[in-house]
Amino acid sequence: MSKKPPNRPGITFEIGARLEALDYLQKWYPSRIEKIDYEEGKMLVHFERWSHRYDEWIYWDSNRLRPLERPALRKEGLKDDEEFVDFKPGEEVLARWTDCRYYPAKIEAINKEGTFTVQFYDGVIRCLKRMHIKSMPEDAKGQAREREQIAPELRLVTEVEPKEDWIALVKAAAAAAAKNKAGTKPRTSANSNKDKEERKWLKVPSKKEETSTSTIMQEVQKKEEEPTSSDTFVGFPIVDVPKMAFVQAESTLSHKRKSNLGNSFQAKRARLNKITGLLASKAVVADGAEKKEGNKETAPVLEQEISPKPQIQKKNEADISSSANIQKPALLSSTLSSGKARSKKCKQESGDSSGCIKPPKSPLCPELIQVEDLTLVSQLPSSVINKTSPSQPLNSPRSYKHSQRRRRSQRLATCSLPDDSVEKVSSPSSVTDGKVFSISAQNQQSKLEVPDVAHMSLEKRGPCLPLDLSRSSEVTAPLSTESTFRNEYPSKDKEDIQMITYLSSKAVTDGRVATTASAPSSHVHALHLELPLTNSLKLPKGSSKKKRSSTSVSSEGTEIQYSVPVKEKCFESLKEKILKNVIEKDKHSEVGAVRVERKGKVEEKSSTTYDFLSGKKKEKEKEKKEKKEKDHKSKQKKKKKKKKKSKQHDYSDYEDSSVEFLDRCSSPLTRSSGSSLTLRSMFSEKNTSYQYPRAILSVDLSGENLSDMEFLDDSSTESLLLSGDEYNQDFDSTILKSLRMKTMLSMKLLDAFVNWMKKMAL
């Protein structure tokens, strides 16, 4: 038997109708009717946003069901309460603004759609629904009237006043607000109003501000003529203020224009100085003529406009700029780069820029000195030029070209500087020290004609100059020593001494000052050992090819000869050098400087011989058969036994000399070189047959005898032979015997090592 659903307001009993249902957790959820069972009076309710497994059958008359739109019912109830209130046009109400708050407003009109046109107290007009308007209480209406008296410029228009006055007031307030926004910044506090107004009118008005103020003044004059709006602008000081402002603005404008002109002239002056320096460095032969003429004309004109100067200084500056532009780029490329570094260093050392441009007192090449001063002056700013430039006359371009040609002819003709000039160069200020030193180095290059040494000119090298001009203060001391060294020796040694001075200048500029010893021979020798070997300058290993006796190095020590590099030698020559180096170590253990130079070479040779010999051993050991090796070993043992028996009495005789020799070689330098030499001697391949030849050092390793001439031909041993003048005695018999002992000991060690290597290979 079917039942009828009950009449419940807000709930429609249809499939898909929405309502709220209470679940078993006693919470209300929006739900929907899925099915209706009319026989039992139940409904299948689905909770929205939940799974269908939570669907539940609920009786339609249960308290767990209620209508979904209960707030709407409340609004309807409020409407019912306020239906009796009826608003009229011109009535003061509380209207809702966009921030959901209610503000006092006035109803302008009632529209047919049921909306109200409302105007707020600030002049904004809106259309609102009935629900967004409330009636204003009586107390609030009185407060609104008090506000009218406090702010007369924003007076509220009541029903008594006509509608036109209200609109005019709103427009005037809007214009005033626009003016405040355009002209002034927002005010932070009422106390600083006067200060900010003064600042505002002190500012220079732009074109936009002038047009806006003029339009505002026109509007204000029009509104003053109207009788109704004349009282409303009592609080606005708009008419009087701009007239005062424009009077002050004109004075400030003129003042600012003057300051801007001064700043622009200063900027132009700095730009001029930069342009003159850049043109001097980048002058090209083709395009340079036009730029030079333009700079000649513009430089003195701008200098006259900037500041009143004496006529002498203006002429000097004009001559400086013109002569700096006429200089050729080949000369300027070397002088400009050095001038910047030197001017910076002078400012750091002396503290005042006038010390940088003092002319040197030396009589050396006055044209060169003028070139240096001109380039330096063109790089410095004009303020420094005004302080430092004296009223001395400068050469014209023609005389300058003439001096250049004369200087070139002097360079080609003489190619040398006097000794006095070299000594005087070190005396001037620190500005020109580095430059004069570089010039003297260039002049020395033309003198040097050593066949094995290739010189490059300083101009061709470009950026990689060997002279570091930032260290010009260090250059002065070695110059004086070299000049005195040059005066001591006659002209026959000029080529060698000049090469030494050129090298020492390189060493000085790299930070390594060459030490000068008391004896001239030690001075020359130390320079050869300490100077760096560059691509253009390489010192040979030994001295010349000539075969000289043990007195080849004279007591004066001034002759310095250069030899061709030693040719590559075969495997047997390496063995010969092993023995020679062992004996040389014993002879010349006192010569420390030579040892230091040879030490690295000996170690490199030992490493190369080890690799070469080890590879060759493996190849030969594979080719040999076991029988031949055994026979060879037996022969070697027999030879050793024979020589031990024959020379056994010599060992007891020379024990003391060998001990002295070991004590003498105990220094760290000789120890390291000796160890490398013994290793080299151990790495030789074949066993030795001990023969005592007629010469001192003709010991054979591979069955080939060495003659005296072949030994003395070696350049490495010849350079190490000591002269009789230094030691005043020749090698005695004890030294020769100790040498023989040393060679025999090294041969024994070599044999033991070879045997051990063969055993390891097997």
From Swiss-Prot:
Top-level taxonomic group: Eukaryota
Q: Name one Pfam family in it.
A: Tudor_2
Indicate the principal place this protein occupies in or around the cell: nucleus
The cross-references to CDD domains, in alphabetical order and at most eight, read: MBT_PHF20L1-like, Tudor_PHF20L1
Region of interest (Disordered), ranges:
178-231, 289-359, 383-411, 536-559, 613-651
Q: Which UniProt keywords apply?
A: Nucleus, Repeat
Q: Where is the composition biased (Basic residues)?
A: 399-410, 633-647
Compartments where found: Nucleus
Known function: Is a negative regulator of proteasomal degradation of methylated proteins. Involved in the maintainance of pluripotency of embryonic stem cells.
Tell me what this protein is called: PHD finger protein 20-like protein 1
Q: What is the native source organism of this protein?
A: Gallus gallus
Gene encoding the protein = PHF20L1
